């Protein structure tokens, strides 16, 4: 099992590295980031992983709402790992004309390819980590399209992972 003070960083880093290796077009900027994921310099692409909420659990993936019995603490800890791949998206030209449908189509293909590759990388990695007993359990959430916001758009994938408390 993954343990210690950096256990959630370790999980997030493994997932970020798996996505990076799976992407057909790997972004220049990638890594584990603290807190909310900022879309800085999305023109060259961005892959970021972050650790969201961390909470005690007795019945994964549900947070422990109260102590049960005489126990002092829940036996498990769960964390939400947030992963995003963001790309440059088409926008209006200097005359204010909207992007062409061909440009939008190309962007949609790239972003949907990223979604497929993200989901495959995360699923494969978490399944292997679970089989190898590096983690206790996991649940993948739905992929959620992001943006466009400004000239950036992409995908967000979340997974909840369980480890023993320590």
Positions of PLM-derived features:
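Small/polar-rich, solvent-exposed N-terminal microdomains that initiate assembly or binding
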Residues: 1-73
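Secretory pathway export signals and precursors
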Residues: 38-40, 68, 84, 123, ...
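Oligomerization/assembly interface segments of phage tail-like spikes and tubes
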Residues: 75-90, 150-165
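A solvent-exposed, charged loop/short amphipathic helix patch at secondary-structure junctions
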Residues: 93-109
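The N-terminal extracellular segments of secreted preproproteins, especially immediately downstream
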Residues: 41-43, 71, 87, 126, ...
């Amino acid at each position: 099992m993954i343990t210690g003070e950096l256990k959630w960083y370790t999980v997030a880093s493994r997932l970020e590295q798996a996505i990076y290796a799976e992407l057909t077009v790997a972004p220049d900027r990638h890594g584990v980031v603290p807190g909310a994921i900022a879309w800085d310099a999305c023109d060259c692409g961005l892959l970021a992983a972050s650790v969201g909420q961390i909470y005690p659990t007795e019945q994964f993936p549900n947070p422990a709402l109260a102590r049960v019995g005489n126990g002092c603490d829940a036996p498990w800890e769960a964390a939400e790992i947030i992963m995003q791949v963001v790309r440059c998206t088409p926008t209006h030209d200097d005359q204010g004309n909207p992007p062409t449908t061909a440009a939008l189509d190309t962007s949609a293909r790239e972003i949907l390819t990223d979604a497929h590759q993200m989901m495959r990388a995360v699923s494969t990695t978490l399944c292997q980590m679970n089989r190898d007993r590096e983690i206790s359990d996991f649940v993948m959430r739905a992929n959620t399209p992001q943006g466009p916001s400004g000239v950036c758009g992409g995908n967000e994938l979340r997974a909840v992972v369980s480890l023993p408390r320590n």
